């Protein structure tokens, strides 16, 4: 499974890259707004750091506007992936962009038929939002399970990006189901490393090591 970082903060991206596990980045207008910086400045900074796919969202609501914004964004770099909402106009735009060879990430997916339509239109990725579904009382991982089965049934090459990750259990469940990618907030990514017994064991090892005579380091 690949790991994308769901952020627009370059400090977080640099840290994850240093860990050696960063495969890409996803952004959205909300994340960019949180930086307090200009849109193009944020995007260019991210593209200068990340070698893998970087999802950047259009804000137009009509298909033609989405396509025009997508074409403009794609000129920023080959790693740019266009985030498109799972609407009728969005799916129309995905079809056009797929024919132009521009990769797309269909976002705000909350039911499996949206993912099916996106894949039919040629989407490169689909992003089911599990955290937001849980917020309204749904078993969100059922959505990922259904999308994975549908894609396997029909041989779609569209990859599943599990998004709106709230805790490590979401990542674990996604990995168990065979999702292609998880896009994870930085704070959750940090939690993936942690276990109390790891810390306790390391503390004990270091304490014991300090008692070893003639230590080389």
UniProtKB/Swiss-Prot annotation:
CDD domains: Transaldolase_FSA. It holds the Pfam family TAL_FSA. The active site is at 83 (schiff-base intermediate with substrate). It catalyses: D-sedoheptulose 7-phosphate + D-glyceraldehyde 3-phosphate = D-erythrose 4-phosphate + beta-D-fructose 6-phosphate. Its EC number is 2.2.1.2. It comes from the Bacteria. This is Probable transaldolase. It comes from Coprothermobacter proteolyticus (strain ATCC 35245 / DSM 5265 / OCM 4 / BT).
